[in-house]
A protein has these predicted regions:
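Iron-sulfur-associated redox domains of electron-transfer enzymes in respiratory
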Residues: 1-216
Length: 216
């Protein structure tokens, strides 16, 4: 949602966006490359479904550039993610099939990769991407685990529309950041950026109030 908003209303800023894809699209590419190879599957026979809180993810998976796996296999028609259903749609599907989750037997999670980190858990809430990114920056630069304050970084948490903070990273210096959720707040932040009234070096935007978990 945020990327589409920027493309429509602030196309001159597209070059400043992170080149990282969303976790949905990263996982889709992994499923049809690494997973397909590990399981001996033809990626053309894999139908990859993502379950997401955000309705905008449906459009994201259909973007023509979201076919990294297709390029890997020499078939541009292979999309990384074939279909997205929202968490609300999943709940409706479960109810329509009269499935009682409490009556289902526990089974072992068939993980193809390591289980998520703490940073992965908070990724979908406002401030979560920023917190994860700063922790990663700290580790990659210093080769040490982040200090306790970066593992419980209250400055970027909470539901204020725009949050600001400065963090010191050895070898980098002071990094000025902002966290914004809700597109009304995004306009306010981007106005400051365009008018050169802001000194932020890294800004997290999420379209929905509260972050991606507020979508759907």
């Amino acid at each position: 949602g945020w990327v589409k908003f920027c493309e429509y209303y602030y196309p001159e800023l597209i070059g400043n966006l992170s080149s990282c894809k969303s976790p949905q699209q990263m996982m889709g590419a992994v499923v049809k490359t690494y997973y397909a190879k590990e399981k001996g599957l033809n990626p053309e026979n894999i139908f990859s479904v993502a379950i997401m809180p955000c309705t905008a993810k449906k459009a994201e998976c259909k973007r023509p550039e979201m076919n990294s796996a297709g390029h890997e296999h020499g078939n541009a028609d292979i999309m990384d993610v074939d279909c997205v259903i929202t968490t609300r749609e999943l709940a409706q599907l479960i109810k329509s099939k009269k499935i009682n989750l409490n009556n289902l037997a526990d089974v072992k999670y068939d993980s193809i990769l390591g289980e998520s980190t703490g940073a992965g858990v908070i990724f979908g809430t406002t401030g979560g991407v920023m917190e994860a990114a700063i922790r990663t920056l700290y580790y990659n630069v210093t080769k040490d685990n982040p200090p306790e304050e970066l593992l419980n970084w209250q400055s970027v948490r909470g539901l204020n529309g725009v949050k600001e903070a400065t963090v010191s990273v050895p070898g980098v210096g002071e990094v000025s950041i902002a966290v914004c959720h809700g597109l009304k707040n995004a306009r306010t932040v981007l106005k400051k950026v365009k008018n050169k009234e802001a000194s932020w070096q890294f800004i997290e935007f999420m379209a929905c109030p509260g972050g991606c978990i507020g979508g759907g």
